[in-house]
Amino acid sequence: MTKDEMIQYVSARFSTEAEYPWADENFIFRHQGNRKWFAVAMRVAYQKLGIARDGLADIVDVKCGPLLMDTYRRLPGILPGYHMNKDNWITILLDGSADDELIKELFEISFDITNRRPTAAKKQPE
């Protein structure tokens, strides 16, 4: 899946548009209700990802949760979360190395995990 294909898929599937909060080409997808991010897309040097290759990679970080992390990180095109908490986020290379159906599955997981509303803090007795 390419970056453009990913944008089209996420926009159609989750009824949201890419937001550009920084003065560059990086962008996020977030929930309209709770405003939480469920994906961050970036262009970074392959070498910053630990890949011995010149050039830039289009990537997207999605939230996965620690219980599924090891399973997904073993698959082609999946890396520990770049620039995010590596216990909860994974990076997907958008260079064709990750299976398209896997990418869609990971977006579903990230969307569901981040769609939960935080519980209200318990009020301390006075």
What are these regions (language model features)?
Residues 1-126:
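Charge-dense, helix-prone N-terminal extensions
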